[in-house]
Amino acid sequence: MNFKYIVAVSFLIASAYARSVQNDEQSLSQRDVLEEEESLREIRGIGGKILSGLKTALKGAAKELASTYLHRKRTAEEHEVMKRLEAVMRDLDSLDYPEEASERETRGFNQDEIANLFTKKEKRILGPVLGLVSNALGGLIKKIG
């Protein structure tokens, strides 16, 4: 009988020891996971701070550039280029969001002004395209003739 008790107690001690080792391994792995998550949070925090600093620097540089450009006198050529860029941006906006662009452009206009506005836009878009096509056809006709 004593032998059975010794074996049973030994078995209980061995299983308790195995469970404690298993629990230690789990707690170590959980601790490792928590440490990894914490280090990732720190890295993300640092990355976020760097990005916000870059955004602030870019905004400041853009504002400085804009204020420098706006406060100096522009030449007629620069003014014309800016007007063309603004027109191109409006045309691109109207292509992306035609309903909003037409609403924005037609606010406060009567029907005649609306018709004139759209014909001006068509001329502005079609004029350069037709000019290029006519130049290309003229060049082909000269080569053939």
Swiss-Prot record:
Keywords: Amidation, Amphibian defense peptide, Antibiotic, Antimicrobial, Cleavage on pair of basic residues, Cytolysis, Fungicide, Hemolysis, Secreted, Signal
Signal peptide: 1-18
Tissue: Expressed by the skin glands.
Any one biological process term the GO annotation gives: killing of cells of another organism
Residues bearing PTM Isoleucine amide: I144
Prodomain residues: 19-43, 74-124
Top-level division of the source organism's lineage: Eukaryota
Function as written in the Swiss-Prot or TrEMBL entry: Maximin-3 shows antibacterial activity against both Gram-positive and Gram-negative bacteria. It also shows antimicrobial activity against the fungus C.albicans, but not against A.flavus nor P.uticale. It has little hemolytic activity. It possess a significant cytotoxicity against tumor cell lines. It possess a significant anti-HIV activity. It shows high spermicidal activity.
Entry similarity comment: Belongs to the bombinin family.
Full protein name: Maximins 3/H9 type 1
Species the sequence originates in: Bombina maxima
Source lineage: Eukaryota, Metazoa, Chordata, Craniata, Vertebrata
